[in-house]
Amino acid sequence: ASGEELFKSKPCGACHSVQAKLVGPALKDVAAKNAGVDGAADVLAGHIKNGSTGVWGAMPMPPNPVTEEEAKTLAEWVLTLK
């Protein structure tokens, strides 16, 4: 599945949209923050799969039911967004 398909089929949309901040940051802002950062896709994939805290403020991101491969596909897709 493509990153966009995974975004739509997983619970991502409950907290994120591409263009606007919801509970979590807009995905275009995640892409902008990580533009040109070495290893950004791997770090982001880890956040998608395992969750994270304190990256975008107080709201934690929960772990998500995705495989390593799905997390990587999602991360790579997010990083292409503008």
Swiss-Prot record:
Keyword set, alphabetical order: Electron transport, Heme, Iron, Metal-binding, Transport
Matching Gene3D superfamilies: Cytochrome c-like domain (1.10.760.10)
UniProt: heme c binding residues: C12, C15, H16, M61
InterPro entries named among the record's database cross-references: Cyt_c-like_dom, Cyt_c-like_dom_sf, Cyt_c_ID
Q: Does the keyword Heme apply?
A: yes
GO MF, one example: electron transfer activity
**Keyword hit for Cell membrane:** no
Q: Could you tell me the superkingdom of the organism this chain comes from?
A: Bacteria
Q: What name is this protein filed under? A: Cytochrome c-551
**Upper taxonomic classification of the species?**
Bacteria, Pseudomonadati, Pseudomonadota, Gammaproteobacteria, Pseudomonadales
